[in-house]
Amino acid sequence: ELFKNVVFRLAPIGRNTARRMIRSIKGYEMLTGFRGKPHADIEEIERLLVGLSQLVTDNPEIKELDINPLFVHGAGSGATVADIIITLEQE
């Protein structure tokens, strides 16, 4: 959102697609230890994306899912979803 850069894929996605999605965002350098900062837990972001993809696949009533913000901690330390909005299909 900060960089006005988002990435979308149709579910389900696997780990390789998740990795490519992450690498395609403008802020990717910030996740890799830019200017001496610690590396972010990119593997956890991958796991989160794959898990959310499976959640949406298993629950077709989910129309839209928005996580904002997602706080990514240092490598091996995970990530925290601070807020999530799930929009369901109206019948």
PLM segments and residue spans:
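ATP-dependent carboxylate/acyl-activation modules
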Residues: E1-E91
